[in-house]
Design a protein with these regions (language model features):
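Single conserved hydrophobic/aromatic residue that forms the stacking wall/gate
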Residues: 1-7, 12
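Gly/Ser/Thr-rich beta-alpha loop segments that engage phosphate groups in nucleotides
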Residues: 6, 45-48, 57, 119, ...
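Residue-level signal for inorganic ion chemistry
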Residues: 7, 44, 109, 163, ...
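Phosphate-binding/switch loop-helix module in NTP-utilizing enzymes
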Residues: 13-47
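Conserved catalytic core of sirtuin-type NAD+-dependent deacylases
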Residues: 19-22, 59, 65-73, 165, ...
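Structured helix-beta-strand junction loops
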Residues: 28, 35, 77-78, 89-90, ...
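Catalytic core of IPPT-family isopentenyl/dimethylallyl transferases
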Residues: 131-258
Length: 258
């Protein structure tokens, strides 16, 4: 129900974030419940899923435009590692969990410390310990690592065929650059580096595939740390989607969801 509601312009200009997602998702869920239906939350970003399932309180983490812009400028001038070192100095737990290239999350953690004089890692741990307000079944669809990596490589090849290079070139022509937090996303920063003459296209594609595989590995690590996840190893079902769906429906019925 939320697909297509957020335009690329909003994302690129950093006007969409987890708090807005939580607000929109909860409103959509209420709309679905009102129709007598069961919401299905689908996605791959663990923190966004957790924001809903644990109903995380973000009131202490409201964004402060002036300080955020100051941090973005520091990242642009001195690099991601400089910003990450700032985080390491005040919140080593978060620094250990957040990659230096994930500038958006580094900035969010620094903002939180700036506003509350306490680390966001402590706040997040407190929120994680909350019991979910929902009767839910948390499924994680999983495939063998070698197949996952092949699919990632194939998907990136397809993205290039569908115009990733042209899309990033258009954004560059509009004034977007690697110093912007939104342009640190996978696909953007690697292609921008190529367009800036830092390395050949073949190297940009190699780095993009490598970093996407690393990202997928971190996602799997996140889900393994989550409580009450139900892992659906697709090879155990011979990749038969009907069998997988039947098992998921059985779990939902057993839990009184259906």
């Amino acid at each position: 129900i939320l697909i297509g509601l957020v335009g690329s312009e909003m994302c690129i200009r950093d006007r969409f974030h987890i708090v807005k997602f939580q607000q929109m998702a909860k409103a959509a869920m209420e709309e679905i419940y009102a129709k007598g239906k069961i919401p299905v939350l689908v996605g791959g970003t663990g923190f966004y899923i957790q924001a809903i399932t644990k109903d995380i309180d973000f009131t202490q983490a409201e964004q402060e435009d002036g300080y955020r812009q100051e941090l973005e400028q520091l990242a642009a001038e001195k690099g991601n590692e400089y910003l990450h070192q700032m985080l390491l100095n005040v919140d080593p737990v978060s620094a250990g969990e957040i990659h230096a290239n994930n500038v958006k999350r580094v900035i969010r953690a620094l903002e939180f410390y700036h506003q509350n004089q306490s680390p966001i890692s402590a706040h997040n741990q407190e929120q994680k310990e909350h019991e979910t307000p929902y009767n839910l079944a948390y499924f994680v669809l999983n495939v063998p690592r070698e197949l996952l990596y092949k699919r990632i490589d194939d998907r990136i090849d397809e993205m290039l065929k569908e115009g990733l290079l042209e899309e990033v070139q258009k954004l560059k022509d509009m004034g977007y650059h690697r110093g912007m937090v939104s342009m640190q996303g996978l696909g953007y920063k690697e292609i921008l580096a190529y367009l800036d003459g830092e390395y050949p296209l073949e190297e940009a594609v190699r780095i993009l595939k490598r970093d996407t595989r690393h990202f997928a590995k971190r996602q799997l690590t996140w889900f393994r740390r989550e409580k009450d996840t139900i892992w659906m190893n697709k090879d155990e079902f011979d990749y038969n989607e009907d069998r997988i769906l039947d098992e998921m429906l059985k779990v939902c019925r057993d839990r009184g969801i259906l």
